[in-house]
Amino acid sequence: MTATKHQRRSGNPAKPPQPRYQPGVWHRNHQFAIFGIVGATALTLFAGFLGPSAVTLTLGPRHSYLPPWYLPANVVKPNEWFVSIVIWVAIVLGALGLWAGLRAMADGWRPKYKKIFVLGTVLSLLTSLVPPMTSADVLMYAAYGRLQAIGRDPYEITAAEVFRSQFDPVLRWTERPWQDTPSVYGPITSWTQLVANKLGGENMHDIVFWLQVFSVVPFILACAGAVMLAHGDPRRQGRAALLTIANPLLIWAVVAGAHNEPLAVMFAVAGLLFMRKNPFVAGLGIGLAGCAKVSIGLWGLAMLWAYRREPKKALLLCLGTAVPMGLAYVLWQPTAFFQALRNGGYVSVGSWANPIYTFLNLFMTEYHAKVVLGVISYIGLIVIAWMLSRVVPWTAAPGLAKDADLKRDPLTIALRTALVLSVAWLITSMYTLSWYDLLAWIPLAVLAANKLDKIMVIRGAALSLAYVPGRAIDMGPALDFTATRIRDTVSPIIQIGMILAVILWWRQPDRPELFPFKKAKALPTTTAPKVTAPQAPASKPPPRSSPSKAARAQEPVPVSELASRRKS
């Protein structure tokens, strides 16, 4: 049980005392949650500020005072083990802090969403002031923008084709393994990459700064939209702020890596804000999101499903979606859409699919192994989505009238369906990474707490740990062995465990634990305890009298006694 302490509001003694949350154990302690969130970001900033290392990207020469900031190269040379351990500790600390925060909220903690949102915003902005870490994707964003700046098509030509034939001050700083891969991003994302190159010139360091801006600003706006979706319910708004902008797993995976997922999610959240008001504008939002990244189409399907009983609104949603999608993929960049679908053919090392892919490669070609995995993945997506649709609780999105049917509210349906489809896709996809989780965290944050909270924390922490250092660079054999085992063994086992957790949830929806490690308490075989009312003072019972002979003669005689009488 959690103890609560009552305090009166200062300045107005007439008002009743305000309950203040007092945790009983550390894993329900909101103060530990805040410590874990802030501590994780502080460790991330520390590792980034040390400068280029096995974890932190090398951005080339600096010719301006623009961020990202870090120590000069001749000050310190970070040890690869030291910075890797710092980031591993940061991820674990952040995950524990988030876990404690969720348990504290379930136990009665009511965080003020404005304070949590400001905290998360500050942490995100600070994280964007140091170099990106572990993932070299941002260098490829810069490369695709550079190709456009010099008049080449990033959907047709690769960065390696250029820098292998001629010197280029930007492309030379890219890293494997994506140097030979054309762009797979939508036209709007490609446009931001071009703008970053225009603003940063021919300096990779400055270009990366602007790409960080195009990551952190949409991230903050998308999280603000999630809090707005929870308007009218301070408790739900506090949850939304904690699981989005102040989520240490997202700050690490999305902001520290300067990934472009927030750009698509920002437009999609804007579309959700209009689900109850204007389906055409909602369609414009999800259409713009699809122009940034095609994978956000899962939310589009969820929004269309929400209007399935209202054909006119469904048509308006489709028309709104078609306007930006048609302009972007038909007129602006016709080849972009097909290139964007290429991610479906990859297998990420940290996913559930990697061990199976390795096994299939023993007796079939890589192509056929991927085909088999693809079939399994799509079947799994359908099955897991169906299972989740049966067990994810129906909770109304804030703002719904009390007398309204939540199962006919388009916003509630869209959020719940987006959550179901996103989680099903994330845990069954052959190619899955921790920064993709933003697609699921946003709708999950707006809806009420459920088992997916735990699943997403465990999944995100495991994938984040798996990609530290996470770069295709030379490192010591000991670190390489350790990081590889986390990536190709530990993480896939945990990802398979998350699929199993969903299946067990579907089979036993009333069990509070993810896994049946704890034996269910057996029901008592004895009768229920009697509830007695307060008894009156005991009085002396009347004297007991024996029944008369006539009464005893009328009492029924047992059969055995009757038989003995007959024998005698």
Placement of each model-derived feature along the sequence:
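Perimembrane helix-loop-helix junctions
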Residues: 298-322
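Transmembrane-helix motifs of polytopic, lipid-linked glycan transferases
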Residues: 93-103, 209-236, 382-390
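Specific aromatic-rich, kink-prone transmembrane helix
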Residues: 225, 263-279, 386-389, 422
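Membrane-embedded helix bundles of polyisoprenyl
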Residues: 120, 216-217, 229, 237-275, ...
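Short hydrophobic alpha-helices at membrane interfaces in multi-pass membrane enzymes
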Residues: 269-292, 316-317, 417-420
